[in-house]
């Protein structure tokens, strides 16, 4: 028999009897400490990395145990703790701690030392009217052309990744001068067509009505005999020979 169990802190160790919820797992797994802005408190992400992340780790463990049973003929218990799962998802920050020898600080939406790699305001300035843009070295010149700043191509202040880090405030400012005049999906379309990785910050309503997600069957409208019509998230895993 292969069987699985999930606990907040597992069945062994000093915290094994402690109760846990999603935010508790994020706090104890290190996720909260690296989420949010530098001058604000540690922040919970409501992407459910503790709940859903633990479940996905558990499924992987079950599949591994089933594969092993095929060769050994023996079953076993699969155990995943919520704290362990969050720690695994925070492994990049743990790596950075080893690299720099100190706790990783909250950095808002800035992605590491990439510049640009941040959120930029868009028209008309609503709570979620932002687009996230990241451009590595080979994307820098196309980005400048798109935002109508070809005059900066070759400018030594921004020519290398290291130089852009030193002038990050200036870079972010002239990118936002362009994005703030455009709706987030318009900005995303223009940038994406130029090969610049980007994404509009979509609220839940926009996600539910996203034409791409609907085309892929990720957002589905269902009819229930007693509840009526409602919308759900579909299956993110696509199998070529199975309709799941």
Residue ranges of model-derived segments:
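Active-site-adjacent "lid/gating" segments in soluble enzymes
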Residues: 1-135
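Short secondary-structure transition/capping segments
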Residues: 16-17, 164-168, 210-214
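Alpha-helical scaffold segments in soluble metabolic enzymes
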Residues: 58-65, 93, 142-146, 174, ...
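Alpha-helix/helix-capping structural signal
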Residues: 85, 138, 202-205
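Short, surface-exposed loop/helix-turn segments at secondary-structure junctions
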Residues: 97-105, 210-224
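Aromatic-enriched alpha-helical interface/lid elements that frame and gate functional surfaces
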Residues: 116-194, 198, 243
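Flexible, small-/acidic-enriched active-site or ligand-binding loops
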Residues: 159, 223-244
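Conserved PLP cofactor-binding pocket of PLP-dependent enzymes
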Residues: 192-213
């Amino acid at each position: 028999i292969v069987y699985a169990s999930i606990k907040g802190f597992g069945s062994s160790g000093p915290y094994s009897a402690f109760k846990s919820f999603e935010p508790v797992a994020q706090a104890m797994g290190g996720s909260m400490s690296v989420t949010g802005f530098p001058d604000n408190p540690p922040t919970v992400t409501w992407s459910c990395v503790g709940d859903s992340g633990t479940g996905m780790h558990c499924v992987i463990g079950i599949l591994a145990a089933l594969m092993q049973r095929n060769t050994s003929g023996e079953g076993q218990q699969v155990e995943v703790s919520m704290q362990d799962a969050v720690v695994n998802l925070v492994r990049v920050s743990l790596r950075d701690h080893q690299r720099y020898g100190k706790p990783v600080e909250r950095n808002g939406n800035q992605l590491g030392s990439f510049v640009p790699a941040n959120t930029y305001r868009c028209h008309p300035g609503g709570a979620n009217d932002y687009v996230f843009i990241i451009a590595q070295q080979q994307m820098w010149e196309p980005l400048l052309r798109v935002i109508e700043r070809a005059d900066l191509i070759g400018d030594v202040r921004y020519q290398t990744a290291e130089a852009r880090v030193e002038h990050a405030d200036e870079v972010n400012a002239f990118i936002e001068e362009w994005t703030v005049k455009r709706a987030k999906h318009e900005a995303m379309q223009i940038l994406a067509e130029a090969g610049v990785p980007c994404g509009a910050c979509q609220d839940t309503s926009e996600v539910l009505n996203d034409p791409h997600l609907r085309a892929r069957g990720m957002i589905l409208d269902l009819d229930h005999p007693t509840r009526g019509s409602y919308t759900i998230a579909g299956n993110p895993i696509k199998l070529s020979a199975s309709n799941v």
